[in-house]
């Protein structure tokens, strides 16, 4: 945690003072924990998109006076799980425009584009950062390099989410919980994904083809979805940090590439 806190502190020092900072990252990568450590000696107000009363408070800020009251006396305002708040993009813009000297932070366990074009709504007001699971160098901070190399096959299989690293015996259950949380809380609820059986079939097909070339049309034929629908689903999965797409290797880019 110390190394991550030190890295984020260095990033904050280079961040423009007139930007709200959005920390993206998959669920359980330590976004909230990191900010708690970073601002433990500051006056911070925490709000969460998972809490109905917090969502109601944020969506009811109808004037600059309301925003001034909310930010009064604060060093930092943190909005956790911001993608669940309706109109979060415009809200962040208004908060940033109205703040006196308060730092504005938002965290999102899926790309905030899922909430309706946040980056477009708050163009010029946001400074995005992405927090990934633990890196090899971070693991080596707390273990010997020999231990890290011996655990490499496991890391390549189940990943390096902090919960999985600290409780390896629960890795399968943790991954299942994270996947279901992302699918049912973010993709189905926020992005409006329907035809859940076909969607889950698509996810299984993608998992079975890791490292292999895939075409949207072929995947669509196998799971009963149209090619444009498959393309949208894959894009949403990537925004939610479930998959990572890699374009085909090409030496010569042309207009047809």
List each model region and its residues.
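Conserved small/polar residues in nucleotide/adenosyl-binding loops
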Residues: 1-5, 253-257
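Pre-Walker A adenine-sensing motif
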Residues: 3-14
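Conserved lysine of the Walker
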Residues: 31
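Hydrophobic positions on the alpha1 helix immediately C-terminal to the Walker A/P-loop
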Residues: 34
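Short glycine-rich substrate-engagement loop in P-loop NTPases that contacts/grips substrate
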Residues: 46-72
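Structural recognition of the conserved hydrophobic beta-strand(s) that form the central parallel beta-sheet
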Residues: 103-109
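Interdomain motor-coupling "hinge/lid" segment immediately C-terminal to the ATP-binding subdomain
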Residues: 109-111, 116-208, 212
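Accessory nucleic acid-recognition modules appended to NTPase machines
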Residues: 176-255
């Amino acid at each position: 945690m110390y190394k991550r806190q030190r890295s984020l502190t260095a990033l904050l020092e280079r961040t423009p003072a007139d930007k709200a900072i959005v920390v993206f990252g998959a669920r359980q990568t330590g976004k909230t924990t990191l900010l708690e450590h970073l601002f433990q000696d500051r006056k911070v107000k925490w709000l969460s998109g998972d809490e109905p009363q917090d969502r109601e408070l944020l969506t009811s800020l109808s004037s600059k006076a309301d925003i001034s009251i909310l930010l009064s006396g604060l060093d930092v305002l943190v909005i956790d799980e911001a993608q669940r708040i309706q109109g979060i993009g415009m809200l962040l813009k208004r908060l940033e425009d109205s703040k006196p000297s308060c730092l504005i932070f938002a965290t999102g366990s899926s790309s905030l584009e899922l909430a309706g074009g946040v980056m477009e709504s708050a163009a010029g007001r946001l400074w995005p950062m992405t927090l990934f699971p633990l890196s090899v160098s971070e693991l080596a901070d707390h273990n010997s390099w020999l231990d890290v190399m011996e655990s490499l096959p496991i890391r390549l299989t189940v990943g390096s989410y902090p919960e999985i690293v600290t409780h390896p015996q629960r890795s399968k259950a943790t991954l299942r919980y994270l996947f279901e949380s992302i699918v049912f809380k973010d993709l189905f609820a926020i992005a409006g994904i329907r035809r859940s059986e076909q969607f889950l079939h698509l996810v299984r097909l993608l998992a079975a083809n890791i490292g292999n070339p895939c075409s949207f049309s072929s995947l669509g034929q196998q799971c009963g979805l149209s090619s444009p629908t498959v393309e949208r689903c894959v894009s949403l999965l990537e925004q939610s940090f479930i998959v990572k797409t890699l374009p085909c290797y090409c030496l010569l880019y042309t207009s047809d590439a």
